[in-house]
Amino acid sequence: MTLSVQSLAMSATAIFAGAAIYVSFVEHPARLSCYPTMALAQWRPSYRRGTLMQAPLAIIGAFLGLVSWWSGGGLAWLIAGLLIGSVVPFTVIVAFPTNRRLEDATLDGASDTVRQLLITWGRLHAVRTALSSVALLIMIFAGG
């Protein structure tokens, strides 16, 4: 049972990390190369859709990582589970203020504020990318 739980934890974390890496290194830089109005118009639906996929993956990866640790998988699984799980409170506490400003319908899409908010969002997303990637590496080296 532990191996299958570990495999599922690793799978959820890998999907999260892979998507986060893609956004950090491909999608968001491309978005920033557009005019702010277009970048914002692309960010909004992308963010909403990404949230529907990424939040459950982080929660599943964290839960199954903790189950793997609890089932005798070792301290590495606890650390990995906590790392991927920390993406959710990080997003809620640290990133949501920026997200909310970007989602604000009264935000002038042509303003310099949009570009600065998108740059800030990219930096915050890079933290999620790093947390999930480190969690995945720990899971891999833990033998999942």
What are these language model-derived features?
Residues 94-103:
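Functional transmembrane-helix hotspots
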Residues 139-144:
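Juxtamembrane boundary at the C-terminal end of a transmembrane helix
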Residues 2-14, 67-85:
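Interfacial segments of alpha-helical transmembrane regions
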Residues 54-67, 128-136:
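Core segments of transmembrane alpha-helices
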Residues 2-60, 103-119:
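Interfacial loop at the N-terminal end of multi-pass membrane proteins
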